[in-house]
């Protein structure tokens, strides 16, 4: 768990934490990638008054995804910044601020950041990765990896309606 002790934060005004979170803490399989190393989290939490607190830091881990062309597993480094601004529930009750703002309650004693960490990881993963810029992918006809084997499938004939455009592209 990744929690900020609100009583300590209220007393010290600032908390700095460096933690490693195991990848098993997050079920990201439904998003098409997996975390292949512990997540390194560096945080600095601080507050200037009783109405708001800020958590800033960085997240770093290794991510394994499939190449978008040949489906080979590709491991890449993911680094992102964390910048969260929370408003106390008491301050939201007395103001006209939007209720969808990140909230905290001093009386709870701690602020759990795991959900926010999960969200930042999922939102910052690249949608597509390639094992190599020159990856040739897989054959649409037979499914062979064209990086390893030559395919004997015949080239599909182009629809004759495209011929006019093909003539113009060769000029």
Regions found by a protein language model. Name each.
Residues 1-171:
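Structured interface patches
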């Amino acid at each position: 768990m990744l929690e900020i002790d609100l009583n300590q934060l209220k007393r010290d005004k600032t908390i700095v934490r460096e933690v490693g979170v195991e990848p098993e803490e997050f079920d990201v399989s439904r998003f098409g990638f997996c975390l292949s190393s512990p997540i390194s989290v560096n945080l600095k939490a601080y507050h200037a008054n009783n109405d708001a607190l800020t958590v800033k830091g960085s997240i770093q881990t290794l991510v394994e995804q499939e190449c978008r062309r040949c489906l080979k597993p590709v491991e890449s480094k993911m680094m992102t910044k964390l910048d969260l601004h929370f408003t106390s529930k008491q301050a939201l009750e007395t103001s006209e601020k939007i209720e969808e703002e990140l909230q905290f309650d001093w009386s709870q004693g701690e602020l759990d950041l795991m959900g926010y960490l999960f969200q930042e990881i999922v939102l910052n993963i690249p949608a597509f990765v390639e094992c190599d810029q020159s990856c040739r992918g897989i054959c649409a006809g037979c499914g062979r990896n064209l990086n390893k084997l030559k395919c004997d499938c015949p080239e599909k004939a182009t629809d004759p309606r495209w011929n006019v455009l093909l003539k113009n592209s060769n000029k």
